[in-house]
């Protein structure tokens, strides 16, 4: 299966610089349709209006965290591939994310190679 580089990707983070970093890395990997949301609530609004092929979200955001966003998405029946990004790599976090239905997990800081390996694991080769 070939990954569709025209799929819509939603990057969710409350830090503008992080969304720009992830956007740049995704573009360097050939993805073209990248959108951003500043928090879980605005991400859910965007997802109500459009179908996304992938969501990459920071864990630690206010008022709705990335894990709360993931739970809300899964509760709605949406199985969109979801990658959580976090600076806190604890066994508890990994287990909580897996229980919530996460597809991939990335530790900060990360680079294009790390992102690509996670994307391949979640989406398949490209």
At which residue positions do the language-model features occur?
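Two-component/phosphorelay signaling modules centered on CheY-like receiver
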Residues: 16-35
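Acidic catalytic/metal-coordinating carboxylates
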Residues: 39-42, 65-68
């Amino acid at each position: 299966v070939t990954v569709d580089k025209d799929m819509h990707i939603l990057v969710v983070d409350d830090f503008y610089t992080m969304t720009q970093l992830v956007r740049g890395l995704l573009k360097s990997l050939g993805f073209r349709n990248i959108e951003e949301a500043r928090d879980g609530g605005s991400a859910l609004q965007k997802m109500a209006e459009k179908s996304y092929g992938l969501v990459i979200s920071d864990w630690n955001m206010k008022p709705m965290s990335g894990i709360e966003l993931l739970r809300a998405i899964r509760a709605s029946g949406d199985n969109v591939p979801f990658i959580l990004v976090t600076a806190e790599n604890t066994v508890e976090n990994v287990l909580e994310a897996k229980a919530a239905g996460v597809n991939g997990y990335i530790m900060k800081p990360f680079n294009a190679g790390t992102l690509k390996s996670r994307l391949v694991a979640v989406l398949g080769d490209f």
